[in-house]
């Protein structure tokens, strides 16, 4: 049956999000049965998703959703920044984080099993999107936090932060989250810096101080001072507040009667080794699917 109406093709496109020619081909193969065509395209989409699963997905977005004392952050990856900026991809990420929050998901498996607003699971929508867009799409990381006061900040879809406070208000928590996005502290307070990190820095500072040729007692004071400065630089509370460098973050929250309990910061593609390909190779790869 090759006489497939444009109306039928349009309906299948709206249901699957696939291209016109792909929809027409599926309808021809299904002898005009739209239900059968949609099912076959779903199976085909699964096959495409499996085929693309091994491809490196290092671009993408961070999405955050906070409500009812709980916050969740998701990193959802694509292969290219072009797809990461696509409205369909961004809508999927937004739907996924809302579904995950509603399901109180704490693992990747729980996120993928969460139901979206249209009744499909995140995993089902993900695989459909792979078939439509033609790239490997992965839900890579999920982080959750619970606190009395939560503030979220997203920078350019690439950095997402949630600050968790005791006391204070959402505006204060958002300011702290924005600071964390900009300053990238290692820990909340200096006493949380791992001992091996402090020991390594002390070793470096000691070698530098000895080169000064000063007396041992002076060298010891120099080392103590440099360690203190290092801890202030890597710990959130010791850092100068980005919106007002005249005050420390510790004073900012203390003056509001609050305390920073925790923060979570995610960067897109953090820790992923990107595969280097030239532009021509990338184009050929996409043409071949």
Swiss-Prot record:
Keyword Protein biosynthesis: yes
InterPro entries listed in its UniProt record: EF-Ts_dimer_sf, Transl_elong_EFTs/EF1B, Transl_elong_EFTs/EF1B_dimer, Transl_elong_Ts_CS, UBA-like_sf
UniProt-recorded Gene Ontology molecular function terms: translation elongation factor activity
PROSITE patterns according to UniProt: EF_TS_1, EF_TS_2
Entries under CDD domains matching the protein: UBA_EF-Ts
UniProt keyword terms in alphabetical order: Cytoplasm, Elongation factor, Protein biosynthesis
Protein family membership: Belongs to the EF-Ts family.
PANTHER family, A to Z: ELONGATION FACTOR TS, ELONGATION FACTOR TS, MITOCHONDRIAL
HAMAP family xrefs: EF_Ts
Protein name per its UniProtKB record: Elongation factor Ts
